[in-house]
Amino acid sequence: DGGAYGSYGVASLYYTGALQTVTYDVPTYRFRGARAFTNKPPGGPKRGHGTTQPRFAVEVHLDKIAEELQLDPAELRLRHLVKPNAVTANWLQLGTVGLAACIEKVVEGSRWKERFRKLPYGRGLGLACSSYITGAGLPIYWNDMPHSGAQIKCDRGGGVTIFCGSTDIGQGSESVLA
């Protein structure tokens, strides 16, 4: 649903398909999508930009698989994570992937092994993952232009200033650059 105008509907749909391969190892992949014009306001890039709804569907499906097979959902995810420096089925070049360490830290900090499937009726403990490819690697929009850049200015007093086109909208880009 891209709304009544062209806007970013096609780009969001592109991200929906392109970025589903960057969390879990998917050796073969096919995506078909359609962008529909509706009488709603135009959609555009906000947090997640085309990835949140399909990622939610994948994560719910993984939970259903784990439940049916009586597997630990955290271990199922860890077993199928994409590896660092991998090239995905749709030719996205990945660099560092810190998701395994993140899951392990969450499992430890939440006392997952002690509490999962052991809480009273109406209480639960869950886990879901997502990834987003950023920075280096192949650009999402294929062209020969640089797809990210920054300038660093060092002054005589030891100060450092970073100039870049990054806008922090809750995704932590200012913290990363600091």
Question: Predicted regions: what is each one?
Answer:
Residues 45-113:
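N-terminal leader/propeptide and maturation segments of large enzyme subunits in energy/redox metabolism
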Residues 92, 116-122:
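Short coil/turn segments at secondary-structure boundaries
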Residues 1-54, 120-178:
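Gly/Pro-rich active-site capping loops and adjacent beta-alpha segments
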